[in-house]
């Protein structure tokens, strides 16, 4: 049973004179502060003036050490507020890395998260769940095994949403434990509740009716995003859902409508199709993934159609509705078409959570999409307040968010650092997955760079045959005259893994000749680099 006590921070001021500049003697009634753990019990903070001691309840919610600052009220009561070198709003990838980087240089750090389960959107509704769903589908449906041993092989019987959800919950719990242990090990305090600015250095943390205040020398806004909602969409979290509430589906829909063909929409469309649902994907844009090399996009589109996905591109959804019995969802298109499905997944954009923080009290303002503007050092218009992660917009990747958070902490505490690299890989976890780093054919053509292409088909690689992947490919782009590597694009199994070989060569301005001249393990997918390099160099 949790033995934490609920004790407010109050210090009675014993005034000896009326000189405001006089340092007044204080008789301390309580020198601990409290906050709620998930079972509505509280956590005791280490005694005032102690070193980085720790306390945690049986549920694992953790309190580290901090300093205190006195704030005097009109009635003579001095409220002793916990004061931190850094308070991080959000415990996702950006918040985690910033908090740990600051703690490593002996700074007092606190993390505020509005949910009982730390880890942010990335762990609970975003990156980790979606990628776990993908891997669970591969395992439960036996897709890779069937490719190797034929359709007669069945790895699992009928696949249900429950089967997938069990695995997702297991991974989420493990990742949450990893984050909690990392923060605890580094002496970082964790607060549960909604963070609101009172002034540029003061935050209040509200958990239901309870609330308490924190002072911070530096603040990092890393509160992430949520699915964008249109007021015309009648969400019910069962038949019409956003991507954060797919778990609300009672079973696998026979027919699914996915509105939005961005990265998230494409990923979930491919997941549902791989499970056997007939998917219609609707987007008002004429093409998908316009930032990706279009040869890769065309190959991906072909394979998605092979999964059974129907594309309705260049079509705007004008109305979404349900029937009277709430058994079917309907999407009406501007062209007059009406699509029926057992479920509709709305995947049109994300909305930043900064619009819930009372930014105006800190002298800041969020844009209409709830995002915060920052400079190249991740500072907002108020220099001691930083922002990182999805809440600042593009590129909104878990990988880049981690580095943004770390760099923000480095700058605020004078830790030597390099600026955010311009070169980073994208991974899109559709079935099949794709990844890219560097330039595309379209950008090289528009900038009039003389380039050549080298391609390796997975069907040429022994390893891919063993894995049952006949459809993948690796594409290298390099300068015709200097042979400098310019871009790397991959489609197929482990594309998001092998892309990093190309990333390293690109970063060091390497030549495509490197792949030709190096010896790779055999059989491996990495061998595709040598095959693609030879293919491209033989075209010169």
Q: What is each residue range found by the language model?
A:
Residues 87-89, 195, 213-224, 259, ...:
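Short hydrophobic core segments
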Residues 236-253, 338-411, 501, 505:
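FAD-site-proximal beta/loop scaffold in flavoenzymes
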Residues 81-84, 100-252, 280, 285-289, ...:
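Glycine-rich flavin
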Residues 89-94, 98, 103-115, 121, ...:
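Flexible, glycine-rich terminal cap/loop adjacent to redox cofactors
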């Amino acid at each position: 049973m949790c033995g934490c006590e609920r004790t407010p921070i109050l210090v009675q001021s014993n005034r000896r004179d009326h000189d405001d500049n006089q340092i007044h003697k204080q008789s301390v009634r309580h020198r601990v502060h409290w906050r709620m753990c998930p079972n509505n019990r509280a956590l005791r903070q280490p005694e005032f003036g102690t070193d980085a001691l720790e306390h945690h309840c049986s549920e694992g919610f953790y309190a580290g050490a901090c300093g205190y600052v006195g704030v005097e009220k009109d009635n003579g009561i001095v409220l002793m507020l916990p004061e931190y070198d850094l308070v991080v709003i959000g415990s996702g990838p950006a918040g985690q890395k910033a908090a740990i980087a600051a703690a490593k240089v002996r700074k007092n750090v606190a993390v505020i998260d509005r949910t009982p389960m730390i880890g942010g959107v990335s762990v609970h509704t975003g990156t980790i769940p979606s990628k776990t769903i993908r891997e669970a589908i591969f395992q439960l449906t036996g897709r890779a095994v069937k490719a190797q041993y034929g359709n007669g092989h069945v790895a699992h019987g009928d696949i249900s949403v429950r089967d997938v959800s069990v695995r997702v919950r297991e991974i989420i719990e493990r990742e949450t434990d990893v984050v909690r242990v990392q923060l605890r090990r580094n002496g970082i305090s964790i607060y549960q509740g909604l963070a609101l600015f009172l002034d540029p250095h003061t935050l209040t943390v509200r958990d239901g009716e309870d609330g308490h205040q924190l002072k911070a020398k530096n603040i990092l806004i890393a509160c992430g995003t949520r699915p964008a909602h249109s007021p015309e969409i009648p969400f019910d979290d069962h038949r019409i859902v956003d991507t954060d509430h797919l778990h609300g589906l009672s079973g696998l829909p026979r027919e699914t409508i996915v509105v939005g063909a961005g990265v998230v929409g494409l990923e979930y469309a491919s997941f549902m199709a791989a499970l056997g649902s007939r998917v219609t994907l609707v987007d008002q844009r004429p093409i998908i993934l316009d930032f990706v090399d279009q040869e890769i996009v065309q190959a991906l589109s072909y394979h998605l159609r092979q999964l059974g996905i129907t594309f309705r591109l260049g079509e705007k959804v004008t109305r979404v509705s349900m029937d009277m019995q709430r058994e079917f969802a309907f999407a009406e298109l501007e062209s007059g078409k009406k699509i029926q499905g057992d479920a509709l997944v709305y995947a049109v954009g994300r909305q930043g959570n900064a619009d819930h923080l009372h930014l105006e009290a800190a002298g800041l303002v969020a844009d209409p999409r709830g995002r915060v503007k920052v400079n190249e050092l991740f500072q907002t218009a108020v220099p001691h307040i930083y922002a990182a992660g999805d809440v600042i917009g593009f590129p909104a990747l878990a990988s880049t968010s981690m580095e943004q958070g770390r760099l923000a902490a480095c700058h605020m505490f004078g830790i030597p650092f390099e600026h955010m690299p311009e070169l980073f890989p994208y991974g899109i976890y559709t079935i099949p997955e794709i990844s890219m780093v560097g330039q595309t054919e379209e950008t090289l053509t528009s900038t009039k760079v003389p380039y050549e292409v080298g391609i390796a088909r997975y069907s040429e690689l022994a390893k891919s045959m063993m894995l049952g992947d006949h459809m993948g490919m690796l594409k290298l782009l390099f300068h015709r005259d200097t042979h400098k590597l310019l871009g790397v694009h991959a489609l197929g199994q482990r594309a998001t893994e092998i892309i990093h070989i190309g990333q390293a060569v690109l970063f060091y301005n390497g030549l495509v000749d490197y792949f030709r001249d190096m010896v790779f393990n055999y059989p491996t997918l990495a061998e595709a680099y040598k095959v693609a390099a030879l293919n491209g160099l033989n075209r010169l």
